[in-house]
């Protein structure tokens, strides 16, 4: 069992707002996992930050008639606010070009490149690259679009096809067009440094095969399939101005920067070092998290990042030789948007700016962050692509959160407030039925915990809601409104059992819906942040309870537009 956990969530490009697909893909499951680990008593660091370098930022700067610095800073702050609004709480939210983090990040990135270069894993090669003669510049990565040479998708970029997820060889793109001018790209010569991924095929295969039965099949099948096809060389330098300068004393390296997918995952490490500098006084304490066999390193990503986190990044770590390989790479699929019954990809160019799929817009409407966290977990694209359906969101909020979980809590606590002076009644007359119900609570807590530990968040939430429905059934069968009239001791035992059950629910809610968990704690008269993943002790008779409040608000049809 690891003594520590280092959990990362994929760095979002700081060139756009966050949408529900981003949240469901990497950030919400990571936050859910971290909350569970901490409640279970583990030492955890949760690392994320904005990906400020590379082509995506340059393109946005051109489109918005701004500078890369301004784009990165602007969206970094907006994304940080979105995360805070959903209570996705990182220990550090850095930025690869943020003033507070850029120096350490460049140090780590350039040191990585230098070590890999010294190890002889790069091939320096004069090569042909796509070029925009009108703009007078080369067209790396997203600066060019064309038809994917793997699957035929018509808007593949020069580094990866978002339809099939495979890496792209830019010169094999059909009908390549410059994103800058729209003109057909031509071919010119330049020099770049290529990481020979083929050198790592055998150790990567062995490492991945050792994860069988531990990792999700979608990650393993994709990565092992890529190795079976043969891993290509990948250029780790680019002909652009915005990024980490290539740290070589070589005339051919002048004016070049590191490929964004070389330096981006290093951000996990540099941000950890920044946290250590701030909280432990020494940035080199990052080794406690990255170079120690007793620390588990868990990466949460979207499906389009699988190739980088399951192949390229581990190969870089192997070439470097020091840091630990990831313990797990947890990848989710894409989440689309259902509009008028039709599935649409969420996109800055095609999705309405005020659509509630943008986190910023959802929060502006004053809607419950926990309701969104619930729905995105219930619809989590863990094994296949799913969709955010505003109508289904309202239906599930009302029929599940309100009618099941919220209803039981309200029934039990308002009964205690009305008939037992807002205190825990005497459980002395508990029956076998009451004890059996609490045994179900123990089992539910165990099942939810097992699901969370295994990154099966959707199943964990299903177990929580299954127990909430059991609680409603228990309340109805025990009928305290009836026993109050002829057997007050039995009525008291029923309500005491319900209060104990709500304590279980508060614990199980914490990773998924922290706001709801705090509300439950307050209604139970407990400190709002004292959550431990362990069976709660029976509440003491006479303990004062808090005031019952509505746990979840009912939504009207069309509440999300």
Summary of predicted features, one role per range:
Residues 78-155:
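A broadly conserved sequence feature marking short terminus-proximal activation segments
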